[in-house]
């Protein structure tokens, strides 16, 4: 027989996040919403289409990259900040940036990567070189690395549709 304790005898520990943590979470949630909206997606896509041919994989950073980076910040970061100010009373981008440095390990990789494109030139350049590689069909293709190996023999052979239906 199981001995059940009443709830008032249980020792519950309640963790309460600070107001600053809660505010940070609200901002991140709003950023996720904003970057998924059509308006932000259109702004970013149009910007990438306009300039992606300027960027290459070379180690050298061309002088032409600087005005493009500044324009990107002016258009996309300002749009993001404007949306956050409209949605969150008293929002301050400088305070958020400071808070982001303290919480960067808690932020989703995609969100952090996108935010870094506003402050880290190399992240910005990488975004463009990745976009260009994808546009030119040089994206990462893992399909050629897949091999089906038989458990009955040591020879490897590709899986054909007829073999797949036989194993079902």
Swiss-Prot record:
One of the record's GO cellular component terms: spindle
Pfam assignment, any one: ARL2_Bind_BART
Signal peptide segment: none
InterPro entries (UniProt xref): ARL2BP, BART_dom, BART_sf
Entry keyword set: Cell projection, Cilium, Cytoplasm, Cytoskeleton, Mitochondrion, Nucleus
Protein location: Cytoplasm; Mitochondrion intermembrane space; Cytoplasm, Cytoskeleton, Microtubule organizing center, Centrosome; Nucleus
Gene3D superfamilies xref list: ADP-ribosylation factor-like 2-binding protein, domain
Family designation: Belongs to the ARL2BP family.
The name this protein goes by in its record: ADP-ribosylation factor-like protein 2-binding protein
Organism: Danio rerio (Zebrafish)
Gene: arl2bp
